[in-house]
Amino acid sequence: MKNKNIYVIAGPNGSGKTTFAMMFLPEYAKCPNFVNADLIAQGLAPFGPRAAAIKAGKLVLQQIREYAARGIDFSFETTLSGKSYVSLLTDLKAKGYSLHLFFLWIPTPELAIARIKERVAEGGHYVPAEDVRRRFVRGISNFSALYEPLFDSWMLFDNSKAKPVLISKRRNGHREVVNEKLFAVIQESARS
């Protein structure tokens, strides 16, 4: 029986999740099924995607359930700033899925806000600065406190430069830290 995999692309708003997914999923993971609330919202309301955000969120969950019912590999992106995916991922793991996380870290909410401003200028979607700041620390905190134990493997990247740089990874219960200094900074911010 083929292994079933879920690839979760996580990180703050503006950390580059969609860009990473578009490059990584087809090449590295060989996973063509990517569920993205922002892209769904843009399809529902191209001139005002924020108005379609709630409906898009519901469609994301519907698409995830559909892929899971079919037993196929898929991916989705999230900030991990909420706790709603804990039960979903637990259920999917119980159904035989292997869970893999790719967390894209950036050092400050200000960098995220600046990237979002650039994205909007290029026709992308807007996220209010107060939402970015609120979600920023919660995402890495929730990864450490809630989500990390659920994943069969994870990789933590510094995505503040042109290309993601590996900070740490865990696979088969073994964690390897590539950049001790950044990893310590991230662990400290997760406890804040």
Regions found by a protein language model. Give the residues of each.
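Pre-Walker A (Motif I) flank of P-loop NTPase domains
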Residues: 2-6, 70-72
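The Walker A (P-loop) glycine that initiates the GxxxxGKT/S ATP-binding motif of P-loop NTPases
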Residues: 8-11
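Walker A (P-loop) phosphate-binding loop of P-loop NTPases
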Residues: 14
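Conserved lysine of the Walker
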Residues: 17
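Conserved substrate/cofactor phosphate-moiety recognition/catalytic segment
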Residues: 21-72
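Glycine-rich phosphate-binding loop used to anchor ATP phosphates in small-molecule kinases
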Residues: 55-106, 139, 155
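A glycine- and Lys/Arg-enriched "phosphate-lid" helix/loop adjacent to the NTP-binding pocket
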Residues: 97-146
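NTP-dependent small-molecule kinase module
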Residues: 144-192
